[in-house]
From Swiss-Prot:
GO terms for molecular function: large ribosomal subunit rRNA binding; structural constituent of ribosome. It comes from the Bacteria. GO terms for biological process: translation. One or more lysine residues are methylated. Belongs to the universal ribosomal protein uL11 family. One of its GO terms (cellular component) is cytosolic large ribosomal subunit. Part of the ribosomal stalk of the 50S ribosomal subunit. Interacts with L10 and the large rRNA to form the base of the stalk. L10 forms an elongated spine to which L12 dimers bind in a sequential fashion forming a multimeric L10(L12)X complex. Pfam families: Ribosomal_L11, Ribosomal_L11_N. Forms part of the ribosomal stalk which helps the ribosome interact with GTP-bound translation factors. This is Large ribosomal subunit protein uL11. It comes from Proteus vulgaris. Keywords: Methylation, Ribonucleoprotein, Ribosomal protein, RNA-binding, rRNA-binding.
Amino acid sequence: MAKKVQAYIKLQVSAGMANPSPPVGPALGQQGVNIMEFCKAFNAKTESVEKGLPIPVVITVIADRSFTFVTKTPPAAVLLKKAAGVKSGSGKPNKEKVGKITSAQVREIAETKAADLTGADVEAMMRSIAGTARSMGLVVED
């Protein structure tokens, strides 16, 4: 028989930097999960990723207080800011442009996000990523 799921917890945790402080500690402690066990497992799983990059994680808490977790790819906005070399997006993206990004960089980000995005093909994912870039005030160049 399948184990009974108690809760799903969705968090964004910096790669290789999970620790018991908020937001990780309170979210897991509320469900009775061993916080240090999660932190060690998460840090081990994300050691190949650039340190400090926010990684979305979905933690499945089982009724016996054990857990499993699935990591996703970093948010597209974070990858776009990193590729463009900007600190933050534009407050007025239709008027003020904050940076430029090439279509090759958009393709690279789309291929990175391919596991998480439900787009039919790379071209569709590229259009989605380009739309995100435009909404952040980035210019997509060919």
